[in-house]
Amino acid sequence: MRISSVLRLVSLALMLAIAGCASKPSRINNVCAVFEQNSSWMNNWKRDVRQASSRHGIPPHVMMATIRMESGFDSKARPRGKKFLGIFPGKKLSTAYGYSQALDGTWLQYQRETGRHSARRTSFSDAADFVGWYHAKSVRTLGLAPHDTYNLYLAYYSGHGGYARGNWRSNRTIQAYARKTADMANSYAGQMQSCW
């Protein structure tokens, strides 16, 4: 009798864990659809973004646009590496990983400064909090406005030191990414009026 009770509990725990796993949303240009596709009791992205926004003072549409640009809402996203002889995986170019594409060192700094030592880059809740934390640091250290998606994204991509040095000024590609992220944030802000 005890073994069957244990098996039932294990089965229930596995079902809850699987139900809580997020799959990549299919309609990533519509933030309301993204929230709708991830709105279970255990995995509620709207709740996660709302909490991170409240904690760090960064608007939710800015955080969602950043995550959209960085990973396309793919929990296991990684930058593409170079290929050796065109087919074999080569050297990794970056340690960026997960929803937020946070680098190893920056993620460790986040864990130390926030006390969230068990935070994972593949957890949407943790990634949303990371993006809010990083943007809030940009607001404090670089004097950026919390709604200035363009410059917040430049600082996110370049790092605080790179942004302060102006490394992005000669990089048209990163400027285009920042413009695209700002446009996405504006679109998300409009969409959120009907689902926030």
Regions found by a protein language model. Name each.
Residues 22-196:
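Catalytic glycan-binding domains that act on GlcNAc-containing polysaccharides
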Residues 1-10:
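Bacterial N-terminal signal peptides that target proteins for export
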Residues 17-20:
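C-terminal motif of bacterial Sec signal peptides marking the signal peptidase cleavage site
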